[in-house]
């Protein structure tokens, strides 16, 4: 099993475990322990923090991936690593002064619809600092071709942390204020672990000078910062805008729906952790055939696996929400079923593009990205204002679908016109037909059992049929090899 397949496999396991724990948090503990209003407050605070984080990191984690393999010497690589640690301080320190000097005004602005938020907005700044440096040290490990530990910390750790804190809150061991403070401490413990791990993998020598190509690094970081800020707005602006435009409970409904649909994104997040450094190396070494292979394989494999998740979620959506009602005792969540479908379509389109985004970001055409991201961010804000007014909180998901689809189409066109390669092939057509066929077939199939039994039964049928078609049509040799390896290991275990 190659480095991409092996680490992607372990990363997918981490992501799926994270989603399982997150599902328990989102569906059971948050509604029962805190209720919809306090849960909505946590969602809004973390969403605001995620918007601030790209400003603090200033794109240096992506600069590290793009330029480390192109550095002419170990000394220049070490300087680049230290550069990546120092640049964020240029933005964090002044922001800290402005944030806390104007704390009252910022709190008043952010809490117009939700007054309870005002006393906790310090979380926004502190979590943003922690996540900014976490991403830098995590990418430090990624350029050493080690993604599994960092991915576990990124995906699983924080959800286990929240589970423990919610249990403590449910048992009245802590109040909401202590929950917020403990959450911050937990994020900084995670930062300490990834810092220690990345330095254990490789500790750079300290040089009291910046890299020779500092101007080039700053230019790239600035453009990626603008791009990441726009992308962060697209991802997190929904929760932030909904927090000002609708009641807290609708933010909670929306968040649960987003969480469900995000499961489709698990393979993308897992595979691209290791693919991104490989893309950068292929571009820096001008290995066109290797780049073409990475794009083609990532597009096919991600669409195959994400397509299975798409069918599992959306063909089971009614039983899934019945099960959520059984666990949470809250019947309002079902109002967000259309959100699941809209965001699911967004995720499946993104999966089909493979590592297109990584190619654009790591190529000489990266200067297109900030304009696309900022344009998309502006578009999603205006579309949110329009569609939330017309469709309620569901309108935010529809706006996201429109913007992300357009964003992906443009990036595919950029790669197609500049590198003369595309993530699509005849396998893409087979997969689209397979996904649509299974979705429509199993959506109309109902069993007269409990929601839990229906989920197990229908999911088993979907997996068996979908994977049988994929193997029979030989859509992906990589997936076929993984399934064959898993089958052999299972047979050896069972004797």
Predicted regions located by residue number:
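Interhelical loop/hinge segments that connect adjacent transmembrane helices in multipass membrane
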Residues: 1-4, 116, 176-182, 192-235, ...
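Signature of the first transmembrane helix
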Residues: 3-62, 91-96, 100, 127, ...
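Transmembrane helical elements of multi-pass membrane transporters/channels
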Residues: 7-23, 182-190, 194-198, 211-281, ...
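Helix-loop junctions and terminal segments of transmembrane helices
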Residues: 56-72, 143, 257, 261-299, ...
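Interfacial segments at transmembrane-helix termini and the short loops linking adjacent helices
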Residues: 103-124, 313-347
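Membrane-interface junctions at transmembrane-helix termini in multi-pass inner-membrane proteins
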Residues: 130-156, 341-375, 415-417
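Hydrophobic alpha-helical transmembrane segments
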Residues: 153-200, 374-379, 393-414, 437, ...
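Membrane-proximal transmembrane or re-entrant/amphipathic helices at the cytosolic face
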Residues: 443-495
């Amino acid at each position: 099993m190659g480095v991409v397949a092996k680490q992607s496999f372990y990363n997918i396991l981490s992501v799926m475990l994270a989603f399982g724990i997150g599902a328990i948090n989102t569906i059971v503990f948050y509604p029962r322990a805190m209720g919809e209003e306090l849960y909505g407050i946590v969602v809004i605070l973390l969403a605001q923090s995620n918007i601030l984080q790209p400003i603090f990191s200033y794109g240096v984690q992506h600069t590290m991936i793009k330029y480390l393999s192109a550095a002419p010497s170990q000394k220049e690589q070490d300087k680049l690593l230290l550069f990546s640690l120092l640049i964020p301080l240029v933005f964090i320190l002044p922001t800290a002064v402005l944030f806390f000097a104007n704390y009252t005004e910022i709190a008043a602005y952010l809490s117009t619809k939700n007054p309870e938020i005002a006393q906790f907005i310090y979380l926004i700044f502190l979590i943003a600092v922690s996540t900014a440096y976490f991403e830098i040290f995590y990418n430090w490990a990624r350029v050493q071709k080690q993604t599994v530990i960092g991915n576990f910390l990124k995906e699983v750790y924080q959800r286990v942390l929240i589970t423990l804190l919610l249990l403590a809150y449910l048992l009245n061991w802590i109040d909401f204020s202590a929950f917020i403070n403990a959450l911050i401490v937990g994020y900084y413990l995670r930062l300490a672990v990834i810092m220690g791990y990345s330095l254990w993998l490789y500790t750079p020598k300290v040089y009291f000078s910046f890299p020779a190509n500092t101007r080039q690094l700053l230019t790239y970081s600035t453009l990626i910062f603008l791009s990441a800020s726009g992308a962060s707005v697209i991802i997190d602006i929904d929760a932030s805008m909904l927090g000002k435009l609708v009641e807290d409970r609708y933010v909670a409904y929306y968040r649960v729906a987003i969480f469900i649909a995000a499961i489709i994104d698990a393979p993308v997040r897992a595979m691209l952790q290791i693919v991104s450094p490989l893309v950068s190396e292929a571009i820096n070494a001008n290995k066109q055939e290797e780049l073409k292979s990475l794009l083609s394989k990532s597009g096919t494999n991600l669409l195959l696996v994400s397509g299975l998740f798409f069918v599992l979620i959306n063909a089971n959506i009614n039983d899934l929400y019945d099960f959520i009602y059984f666990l949470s005792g809250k019947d309002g969540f079902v109002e967000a079923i259309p959100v699941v479908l809209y965001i699911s379509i967004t995720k499946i389109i993104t999966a089909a593009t493979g590592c297109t985004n990584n190619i654009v970001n790591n190529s000489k055409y990266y200067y297109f990205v900030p304009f696309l991201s900022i344009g998309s961010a502006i578009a999603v804000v205006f579309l949110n204002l329009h569609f939330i007014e017309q469709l309620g909180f569901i309108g935010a998901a529809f706006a996201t679908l429109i913007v992300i689809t357009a964003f992906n189409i443009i990036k595919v066109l950029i790669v197609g016109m500049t590198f003369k390669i595309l993530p699509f092939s005849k396998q893409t057509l087979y997969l689209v037909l397979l996904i649509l066929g299974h979705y429509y077939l199993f959506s109309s199939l109902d069993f007269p059992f409990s929601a839990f039994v229906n989920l197990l039964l229908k999911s088993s049928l979907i997996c068996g049929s979908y994977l049988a078609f994929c193997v029979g049509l030989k859509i992906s040799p990589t997936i076929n090899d993984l399934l064959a390896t898993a089958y052999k290991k299972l047979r050896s275990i069972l004797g």
